[in-house]
Amino acid sequence: MRQLLEASPVNDPFGYPVLYVDLRDERRALLFDLGDIGALPPRKLLRVSHVFVSHTHMDHFAGFDQFLRVVLGRKEGIVLLGGPGFVDQVEHKLRAYTWNVVHRYSV
């Protein structure tokens, strides 16, 4: 039997929660929560098509800024999904930046 996906926790059980799911045949991946993503190399982050955030406590959302830096400017869009109020919270994070050096990107 061929394995279609591989789910891997990014951190140890006591670290910030992040689950990376590689959809092998589709050449893309899913992220569940954005805690500490420092252990994921950029090549893996660039495969992510969807991010599912359970809630925006710091331990589940602290990696958002790092994720944004890696994927900003790529051609493919990314779907961010979260609970009630999530869109407003992401909007506030994006508005907190000064965007004068990224004028060529659509955010």
Q: Model segments located where?
A:
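Binuclear metal-dependent hydrolase catalytic cores
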Residues: 1-107
